[in-house]
Amino acid sequence: MAETSNSENKTSEEAKASEKNSRSITLEETKLENMNSEESTQTTESTQAQAAEAADSELSLQSELDAAKKEVESLKDSWARERAEFQNFKRRSAQEFVSIRKEAVKSLVSGFLNPIDNLERVGATQSPSEELKPFVEGVAMILKEFYAVLEKSNVIRFDPKGESFDPMSMEALSSEEGDQYSEETVIDVYQAGYYYKENEDKFTLRPARVRIGKPKS
């Protein structure tokens, strides 16, 4: 009987110990689950925070990119306006330079034309006497030198006799009509004309004064 009682007591103690161990294991498992749950929650929160930070960073970069694009467009517009203004300035400057140059050339050359006209009249003397012949020949040589100097400065003398009348470079002082004329034609030159020519730039310094023949009306 005593052995049976001891055996039952032992079994009861083992059962209690087993139950205690089972409770301990369950408690540890519960703690572990709680820890895992907390870690999972922290990981989720950290991931969400990183995602939010990345989204904010992306928005900031996009905003900076948009601002940079706007600045580039503004600079392009500004450059285009500046370029257009510069081209207009160059065009105005070129036109002003041409105008100033024309006036300067006219002013300079006009001072020589009357003396040249006088020398031409002397050089055109018909049948000069033996005494005047050397003088007339000397004047002709001086005139050739004058013409050469003027041509080096792009100033050209023109005598349009026999050419079609051009009102832009000639001035008709008199005229006559005849069946022999199919168009207005220069038949006599009272005074030679002069023009300035440099590359494609050409303008009249003094129109030629002429007599023209015209078809009968």
Curated annotation (Swiss-Prot):
It comes from the Bacteria. One of its GO terms (molecular function) is unfolded protein binding. Keywords: Chaperone, Cytoplasm, Stress response. The keyword DNA repair does not apply. SUPFAM superfamilies: Coiled-coil domain of nucleotide exchange factor GrpE, Head domain of nucleotide exchange factor GrpE. One of its GO terms (biological process) is protein folding. Pfam families: GrpE (PF01025). InterPro entries: GrpE, GrpE_coiled_coil, GrpE_head. Gene3D superfamilies: 3.90.20.20, Head domain of nucleotide exchange factor GrpE (2.30.22.10). CDD domains: GrpE. The keyword Chaperone applies. Homodimer. Belongs to the GrpE family. This is Protein GrpE. The gene is grpE.
